[in-house]
């Protein structure tokens, strides 16, 4: 058991070091993953993508299990601008996913994960501190397909909806028990200055870095800003 633990920890630490080597590449990969997921025929319902206040993309989340397993991933969150988070898409902030999972066999599984943050309470929690899904914020597997006809009340009431893609299969997935937190160190490396997730998302005039342009462009193309959807007019 000790030997397995050492192997798994070496895998995690080694992957973390490699992941930290190039934050720009990680951010660019977020755009690639988001585009590929939206190209799937039965993907995220258009209505949900359009009304989401933020989108988090975690490429290659890895689960490592030792009886009681763990998961980790690094990615980015993009939110709509404006005090009510209902404007055009803004600049990305880097985020980290961490947590435990029970029941995995010894080994690792890589999965791309997308979260939709559906209301301001969820956004504020994510900008403030580390958030445990299913704890301080409600979370559920997101419905998929072109419409919301098959969605459940649970998913529609949740603050965060989660989706995954593994081995070419895309589906809503529950990630309760995992945690999301701002990765401000990674954001500082991307922007070249001292920044926080809240400052990036809510601060005035934060420019989208070149490495994040593809991700923002994908969101603008698939869920463009629409003046009629502003919350004040709903």
Task: Locate each region found by the language model.
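Small-residue-enriched, tightly packed secondary-structure blocks
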Residues: 20-234
